[in-house]
Amino acid sequence: MPWDFNNYYSHNMDGLISKLKLSKTESDKLKALRQIVRERTRDVFQEARQVAIDVRRQALTLESVRLKLEKTNVRYLSPEERADLARLIFEMEDEARDDFIKFQPRFWTQGSFQYDTLNRPFHPGQEMDIDDGTYMPMTVFESEPSIGHTLLLLLVDTSLKSLEAENDGWVFEEKNTCGRIKIYREKTHIDVPMYAIPKEQFQKKQTAADSAHLIKSDSVFESFALNRGGREAYAVESDKVNLALREGVRRWSVSDPKIVEDWFNESCKRIGGHLRSVCRFMKAWRDAQWEVGGPSSISLMTAVVNILDRESHNGSDLTGTMKLIARLLPEEFNRGVESPDDTDEKPLFPAESNHNVHHRAIVETMEGLYGILLAAEQSESREEALRKINEAFGKRVTNALLITSSAAAPAFLNAPSKEPSSKPINKTMVSG
């Protein structure tokens, strides 16, 4: 008989969603790890600022700067990196040094933890990912771009390398767009991309927070950001948000993570609350099929949004909605998946004419998902249906009683989501 999988997907105790969502305890633990990184980063910048103050007040020599840095967390850098950092602080122009002394780093979490689509890992070796950007004012490098670029990289690396040295099982990795600290015991890594924003916009943020007496508290800053006044006060022009790069000729890339965050939040409002759950399910399918690799989370999310924007569907019928997505997903990826951030220069997934072996393998695996869901629906027993659908999402759900006989098809379907009228996106950056 036809089986219905709505409870399989949505039951809050035994269903797939319950196996994917982090508990409050798990979420709080990740926030605590994030806070450790933030506090260390803040401390490292404070140490560097104090040395910069001493250079201005005491007319230190380069050797004196180097010796002072040796007594800080900078000691965890390599000798070459320590020498570079000492030189950068020593050679700062007066205006750049004054601004460096004045401003503190601010933090903004991006990615799945911020979107509320972060799943528990499935295969051994898979990790939860927190992206937590560090932001500093652009005037540090207005006169000489290389100063601000290298300074940010070295100071954030100092933070992560010092944590690596002090915590067993914490491992630093250098990435092109971020520093990463892997925390194996918690199956987690924290990425710290480094951004620069214009001094003027940074000052507006700081003034708004000061006036609300919020500047001292990470948690209060985040609460402030959630209300309308806070978000407006923290607006930043997206073309002024610069991401530091380690590799290649370009030192900076215009990149505002809030573009994608705002796009996804608007998509959830437009399509419905089921969008977040469906994105979680597709990421769970990806994690079950590939121990490493597979389509990126943002490419899956974008493809799902594209499909549900176009196609009539009943958001409360997860069985039907997941079949709809599974049927159309290969075609969506063969067309190519463009980023919702129009500043991205490359597609999230190339069109079929540009596929290599890796891309073709991904689409072939996608093509199998629809068949699995149909076979599960037509299984002879609940137990067989459970075994079959778990081929797609992994053996997370074990209660076959969640699978029920299929009810009549719903009489009313949601119309495809209309394309929203063109309007400026509220692109913000918040300190955490």
Curated annotation (Swiss-Prot):
Describe its function: Cyclic nucleotide synthase (second messenger synthase) of a CBASS antivirus system. CBASS (cyclic oligonucleotide-based antiphage signaling system) provides immunity against bacteriophage. The CD-NTase protein synthesizes cyclic nucleotides in response to infection; these serve as specific second messenger signals. The signals activate a diverse range of effectors, leading to bacterial cell death and thus abortive phage infection. A type II-C(GA) CBASS system.
Name used for this protein in its record: Cyclic GMP-AMP synthase
- Describe the effect of residue 110 to A: Large decrease in catalytic activity
**Catalytic activity of the protein:** GTP + ATP = 3',3'-cGAMP + 2 diphosphate
Record-listed E.C. numbers = 2.7.7.-
Q: Can you tell me which residues bind GTP? A: 110-115, 283, 297, 344
Show which residues constitute the signal peptide. none
Q: What class of enzyme is it?
A: transferase
**Misc remark:** This is a complex CBASS locus with the loci capE-cdnE-probable diadenylate cyclase-capV-dcnV1-cap2-cap3.
Q: What cofactors does this protein use?
A: Mg(2+)
Q: Record-annotated residues binding ATP?
A: 180, 255
Gene responsible for this protein: dncV
